[in-house]
Amino acid sequence: MSNNDYETVVGLEVHAELSTKTKIFCNCSTEFGSAPNTQVCPICMGLPGTLPVLNEKVVEYAVKAGLALNCSISMDSKNDRKNYFYPDLPKSYQISQFDKPLCNNGYIEIEDDNGNPKKVRILRIHIEEDSGKLNHNEFAGGALVDLNRAGVPLIEIVSEPDIRSSGEADRYLKKLKSILQYIEVSDCKMEEGSYRADVNVSVHKPNEPFGKRHEMKNMNSFKSIQRAIDFEIKDQIRANESGETIYRETMRWDDVSGRTFSMRDKEDAEDYRYFPEPDLAAIKLSKEYIDSIKNNLPEMPESRKERYMQELGLSEKDAKALVSEKAISDLFEKAGKICGNYKSVCNWLTSDIARIQNERELPSEKIPFSAENLAELVEIIDNGTISTKIGKDVLEIMFDESKTPKEIIKEHGWIQISDESEIKNVVLEVLANNPQSIEDYKAGKDRALGFLVGQAMKQTK
């Protein structure tokens, strides 16, 4: 039986670390990459007698995200304790939100697999603290706990079960990431774990109830998420067709083998024994506070796309590609403003730069050259200093070396001769040095002309 005989249901719970300078309940730094256990205090270590103080910036960023994602903002919410034991959770509970989250009932607009507009509903957005991190160490004979991440503020964005394929999941996650970056509440660096997703997948036959779902936790690669969803769809259909019982389980995705493995039964809300956090007051928001955040939201991707099409004359395809990532859109705007040739900057970003990024699996935030250098590359091609072909070689070097385009072409002797009199002198010299080739060409040997052209190119290189 094929996939077409079943319907797929995907739900996503996205955890995005907020870009605050300090943690959610204490003044410890949230900077990534510090030595283990150097950004901790009695509060985030969960020591007895300590009391949390809510970081006001966390609430502001969560409300900002909710507004950007078309949510209703709750004027009366609270924190709750989510109780479970794990070595990287020092208090043995996580301060989160249960029945009264900050944001409810939002949506994101994406395209379905046929290119048609589709709304994916967002059930809720709530704030919570991140856990610590286990570093497995063979020399220690186990795992070492690093609590630098404990207490880093998160928003959890929970979708309704509206997604029907791995492709839709991919587009949803990328659109969500883009929006969070545009409003600057999270850097969404997947390689650092600041944007990760719990992925729930189930299958069922049309007009039948949803099937039991498998959950894969803390996934931080778009490619892996798509592969994991596709595997689960096929494996659950196989299990259904062979009469196996599918249980609600938490699964582990293995990138090497390309399959999932069962870890444990899936927990229910009652397993966490939620109860109100007694050490924190309720979160009361005024309409004026919410409106002030709403009125200061930055330009969103859709608005930028329309502006690029109307003011700069870009095609919808190019405008859509540029605004899909804030880093690319910002690079485009800055470089275009410097050199004045927005269309040429667009062509480089959507073709050769995108190709090199894809080949090197390089996030847009890590493009190693500045807008000034990209603008300089466009300018020296526009004024005839180098050809577009040489420009592609210069671009490759710009990804590897911290040099300006002018420094690169000078170093490699790639400056193109554009003076007609100088070119004429070169041609006359080549003709004078190769009389036999001239005679061969006159005799109908076309290859002789290619030889002469090659000699001229060699001298002008």
How would you describe each model-predicted region?
Residues 1-299, 316, 337-341:
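Basic, nucleic-acid-interacting segments
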Residues 302-309:
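Extended, structured, electrostatic nucleic-acid-contact surfaces
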Residues 192-205, 309-333, 342-360, 372-374, ...:
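Core structural elements
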Residues 365-375, 379, 385-458:
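Strongly charged, low-complexity linkers/loops
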Residues 289-296, 303, 333-338, 374-386:
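Extended, non-catalytic structural segments that build the interaction scaffolds
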Residues 313, 336-345, 385-386, 443-447:
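Structural motif
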Residues 61, 65, 172-175, 179-182, ...:
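Generic, well-ordered alpha-helical scaffold segments in large soluble proteins
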